[in-house]
């Protein structure tokens, strides 16, 4: 592990905005965080995997959600950097942050299909919230990502 943040690469990742029929956004509380931080499903891209495949895989791995339709693949990539206190802890110290491709999807199923008690659970609870509130619940170092994503979703909904 390098102590020099600049020398560490960004991890390729995906993020998924899941909207229900009422245009509420799926968020979940991380199991490894004592504070009241919530996030949308997200995760890394495996070697040889394209972004969309990674998005579907991460969504199912974290939430058991399969019944979705793709609304939009957002343009560009959005990156965030880990704060110093998390370097060397998250992702085994291999990355300084994540560069993400975001997708907006519509959940077509019923709430009882959502199960966060997966093989490797990441979340302790989940809920649907208004789009306007997604920036109120996120950890500070991802705030700019969620602001950007919120604007992209607003463009779709308006």
Swiss-Prot record:
Keyword terms: Hydrolase
Among PROSITE patterns, the record links this protein to: NUDIX
Q: What is its EC number?
A: 3.6.1.-
Write one Gene Ontology MF term: guanosine-3',5'-bis(diphosphate) 3'-diphosphatase activity
Superkingdom per UniProt: Bacteria
Q: What Pfam families does this protein map onto?
A: NUDIX (PF00293)
- Per the record's keyword annotation, is Hydrolase included, yes or no? yes
Span of the annotated motif Nudix box: 43-64
- InterPro entries, alphabetically? NUDIX_hydrolase-like_dom_sf (IPR015797), NUDIX_hydrolase_dom (IPR000086), RppH (IPR022927)
Do the record's keywords include Hydrolase?
A: yes
Q: Which Gene3D superfamilies does the protein's record reference?
A: Nucleoside Triphosphate Pyrophosphohydrolase
- What is the protein's known function? Accelerates the degradation of transcripts by removing pyrophosphate from the 5'-end of triphosphorylated RNA, leading to a more labile monophosphorylated state that can stimulate subsequent ribonuclease cleavage.
Q: Which HAMAP family match?
A: Nudix_RppH
Under which name does UniProt file this protein?
RNA pyrophosphohydrolase
Q: Which gene encodes it?
A: rppH
């Amino acid at each position: 592990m390098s102590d020099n943040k600049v020398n560490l690469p960004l991890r390729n990742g995906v993020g998924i905005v899941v909207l229900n029929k009422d245009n509420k956004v799926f968020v979940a509380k991380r199991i490894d965080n004592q504070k009241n931080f919530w996030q949308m499903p997200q995760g890394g891209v495996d070697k040889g995997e394209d972004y969309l495949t990674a998005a579907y895989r991460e969504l199912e791995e974290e939430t058991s959600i399969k019944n979705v339709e793709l609304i939009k693949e957002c343009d560009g990539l959005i990156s965030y950097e880990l704060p110093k206190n998390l370097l060397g802890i998250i992702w085994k110290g291999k990355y300084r942050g994540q560069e993400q491709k975001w997708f907006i999807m519509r959940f077509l199923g019923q709430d009882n299909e959502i199960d966060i008690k997966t093989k490797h659970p990441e979340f302790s609870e989940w809920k649907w919230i208004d789009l306007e509130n997604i920036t109120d619940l996120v950890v500070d170092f991802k705030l700019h990502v969620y602001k950007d994503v919120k604007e992209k979703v607003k463009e779709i909904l308006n």
